[in-house]
Amino acid sequence: MKEFLNNLNYGISAHEVSNEFKQILRELLANNIIKEHKNRYYLNNGYVFGTLDISSKGTGFLQCFDESFKKDLLIENKNLKGANYKDIVAAKLLPLKKKRPSANVVLVLKRANETSLVITKRYGEAVLGMNIKTGLSTALKASQKSLKALPLGTILKIENQDNNIIEVLGHIDDESVDEKISLALFNKNNEFSDACIKEALANGDSVDASMYENRLDLRTLPFCTIDPIHAKDFDDAIYFDTEKRELYVAIADVSEYVYAYSAIDKEARSRGFSIYFPHIAIPMLPRPLSENICSLKPHLDRLAYCFKITLDLDCKVVKEELFETIINSKRRFNYDEVDEILIQNPDLKELSWLYKLFEITKNLRKMRLKNAFEFRTEELRMNLDENLSLKSTVFEKDTPSHNLIEDCMLLANKAAAKLIDVGVFRNHSSADMKKIDRLLNELLELGIDVKLKPNLPELIRDIQALADELGLRAEVDKLIIKAQKKAEYSSVNAGHFGLGFDKYSHFTSPIRRYSDLILHRLLKAKQKKDEKLFNYLLLNIQNTCENLSVLEREADKVAYDFMDRKFARWAAKNIGKKFKALVVQNDGICIAKLDDEIKGADIILYDTRVNLLESVEVQILEADIIMAKIYAKITQRLRKESNV
């Protein structure tokens, strides 16, 4: 469709329009979006086509197909005309009154999703559905008698085409409904089809080693897994031979169980990624695979795709070998346990290799960061009680164990990327210099005066050094990340700017990332010199990569939406109370992040005259549980950054 719509910019004749687009052509004519001239159809001035993105606040952003528009067009909630997330729409440009170009939706050309979520509300004598994403009300295809039989506040899934009710998800007062809402808003599903479950169960729950005589048997090696404390899907296990200086990175061999174009594969492709909520994971693969036969559980034989990476005394890679193996992990660690071992008990004989590996990865990290960036990012961990109410939050920082695993995985991912010239790469482009220039202006207001220089890694390190002096490193790192482009998947290698790698891919998480599963299949086909299979696996690979980049962002949005809902429920119980917060956005809408006993919640401030990264005290005035928004006013300015 994108190609058809773009052709209207230059004119397209009637016979060039396929049957697929003739109805759309008629609708465009009826709405005066296009005109006919000498048997050719042209887009009228002032109209654009694009894909709609909608923020958590209900504001629309149109990603224009016309590449001359360098920035997304702002579409206010009232101008969405019923359009939803990822819909392809025709929009009319509005007179430029603000800095950001804006438009309003004229016609929805293609629905991205067949369904929407609404909550029942009374409007006068009638019960209507209010769209949870946009806040717009709509009449439902059901009798008022049946709608009034439902308690107000019932969450319904409806068809976008005719507003027919498909499913009752629950009631807004029930906190367990949040998970269903977050998944349904982005068209995600927790359940697997009967065909997927049947395929998964057919693999059994144990590995018979006698069936895999051609695999390298590494079961005697003392592999271990290191994961979060509540993890069930163990993708990777490691072992380091201290005498031979050989690092083994064993990855769950999912491709042995999930064949291309099988029912599970089609479902995994559509999901793209596992989604992680604080209380549960929504897996990419059925649980009999993700949490059982594929998971590298301790003391069980498991199939693994394993890199053996040999390092010299200077910690440089001298050899990389890839094998189909069978392993038996000897121990399952969580990160906290390994941190304690590395810091307090480095002399444990049975784990001496782990401590020596840690010393090596510290050197690897030091060498890598000469050409890469190190950001002090903090992952928000939310703890819920038995009723799924917010109990506490904590920001988890990188620890020695996290760094150890990260650098081992980077070695394997980098090694895998070297083996292919086309396939699945993880690319990260150099930063947009306009965004960097804007960042420098923002930092100047904080007292961080850094002059623009052509060497971007050097520039960022200068910024970080000054941020360290001001005690603002973590906050400034987030601004730097925001100014950079997002990493994406592509069939063609373009390097990874942030990591400083010429070539990079994702190999180490096939249980939770579809990109890694594709790469495993490609590598196996290449090792077997099966060119026919390799090319077969490459069919539509660029489209697949582009779709995976979209699915990755969606998976993040689902997780963030769920947390926003829990924060909003917490705020509703704390109306009128005061908390510390940090201003993280002050361009147009002013937003602060809660920085008190509860951390990380986005607070929309009614006050706009406030400095970026200023610490303030806020009083919660309103919590919208339906739209997952919190509103507050500033009661005290605790610190101005210019005085830091």
Q: What is each residue range found by the language model?
A:
Residues 1-251, 255-301, 569, 606-617, ...:
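Charge-lined substrate channels and their catalytic hotspots, especially those that engage the 3′ end
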Residues 9, 157, 181-182, 195-644:
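Electropositive polyanion-binding surfaces
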